[in-house]
């Protein structure tokens, strides 16, 4: 059986992140209190949208950063174990995950996957699986 040393939990701004963190805590306890880190990857309009858009991207990013900070504050109240690191990535999800997993010796990543039509189009699970060479726990959300 693999002994995990550093678990990365990919969170979003939804309450579903709490269940991912709970799973990470459970797995960490089974593996001699493996370190747990969190990552949020911001893939907003400025990075993902290629067409014409008539909005002020800086305002969207500012609101999104405020949402992220609020989410992280709420998570601190929920989490009863030490969080090793918190990462906020921007842009391509696969690149951000690859960078963090290599630099910080992550050996397990936990993330959720929504089972709806749009998520199948937007979220490229295959690209992540083919790029990251570590164990993954994919938790389906319905």
Swiss-Prot record:
Compartments (UniProt record): Cytoplasm
Similarity comment: family membership: Belongs to the universal stress protein A family.
Protein name, as recorded: Universal stress protein A
Complex and partners: Homodimer.
UniProt lineage: Bacteria, Pseudomonadati, Pseudomonadota, Gammaproteobacteria, Enterobacterales
UniProt keywords, alphabetically: Cytoplasm
Family annotation (InterPro entries): Rossmann-like_a/b/a_fold (IPR014729), Universal_stress_UspA (IPR006015), UspA (IPR006016)
Keyword Membrane: no
Major location category of this protein: cytoplasm
Gene Ontology CC terms, in alphabetical order: cytoplasm
Function per UniProt: Required for resistance to DNA-damaging agents.
